[in-house]
């Protein structure tokens, strides 16, 4: 176990180890406890347009249950954090941010757009990631509806009397799901998944090696407040409309870099 962002995180699990957990996720299904990530709801008359003032992504173009990767920018175009944004409905967004940046992110959002939206952190929700080629059949044994989900979508549903949010997304380069559940139900839900022999626990070490192998950025290593999306090779996160309209923090610097 190692300390990380105020949590004790497992680097690896007994009987497995980083390499075995990495390979098991690539060939079967790895289960990661990522409850340290920050979860929150952003609500208001038009939270997507409000959020677009501080991110360069197309949030207003999201449909219900669709999610998008984007970055939170400071006034110099530097990356405060990268995050996932899901539109639940026209008045509600679901945010997932990095653990080490959670307080900073939430404070920045409140400072910049707090007069237009309500930010509701969800500290009593846990988060698990089920990743790998056998993740879908493993989760579908418990919740058949997930088999029809498409990449980068999220659905809210009831399971055994608990509200859960399931997205088809991940941080490993594999097919998989990220599952937000009430903390009080997390252990029972994990045990149900682990009854399937294809599912094994995987720790922080394998999570890092898997994302590195997949070419995915890690905040604090590949991204920071002195690095713009252009410098981080994240130009693809800034669509045509946002390039034409601007209007986000640091836009003058970022858009000038895009033209070079």
Located regions from the model:
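Acidic, proline/glycine-enriched N-terminal capping motif
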Residues: 1-72, 78, 204
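Generic preference for hydrophobic/aromatic residues in regular secondary structure cores
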Residues: 29-32, 42, 85, 117-119, ...
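Acidic active-site catalytic centers that drive phospho-/nucleotidyl reactions
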Residues: 33, 82, 178
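Conserved, structured C-terminal
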Residues: 1-13, 19-21, 88-260
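Well-ordered mid-protein domain cores that form the structural environment of catalytic cofactors
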Residues: 58-112
């Amino acid at each position: 176990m190692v300390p990380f962002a105020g949590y004790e995180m497992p680097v690896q699990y007994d009987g497995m180890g980083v390499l075995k957990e990495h390979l098991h996720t690539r060939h079967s299904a790895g289960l990661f406890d990522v409850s340290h990530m920050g979860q929150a709801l952003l609500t208001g008359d038009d939270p997507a347009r409000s959020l677009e003032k501080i991110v360069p992504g197309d949030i207003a173009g999201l449909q219900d249950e669709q999610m998008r990767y984007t970055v939170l920018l400071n006034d110099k175009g530097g990356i405060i954090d990268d995050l996932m944004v899901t539109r639940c409905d026209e008045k509600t967004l679901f945010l997932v941010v990095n653990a080490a940046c959670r307080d900073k992110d939430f404070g920045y959002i409140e400072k910049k757009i707090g007069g237009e939206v309500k930010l509701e952190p969800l500290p009593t929700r846990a988060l698990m990631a089920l990743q790998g080629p056998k993740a879908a059949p493993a989760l579908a044994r418990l919740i058949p509806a997930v088999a029809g989900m498409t990449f980068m979508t999220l659905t809210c549903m009831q399971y055994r009397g608990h509200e859960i949010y399931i997205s088809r997304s991940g941080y490993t380069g594999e097919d998989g799901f990220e599952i937000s559940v009430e903390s009080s139900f997390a252990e029972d839900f994990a045990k149900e998944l682990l009854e399937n022999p294809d599912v094994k626990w995987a720790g922080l070490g394998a999570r890092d090696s898997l994302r590195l192998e997949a070419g995915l950025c890690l905040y604090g290593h590949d991204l920071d407040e002195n690095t713009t999306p252009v410098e981080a090779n994240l130009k693809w996160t800034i669509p045509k409309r946002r390039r034409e309209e601007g209007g986000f923090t640091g836009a003058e610097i970022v858009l000038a870099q895009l033209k070079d």
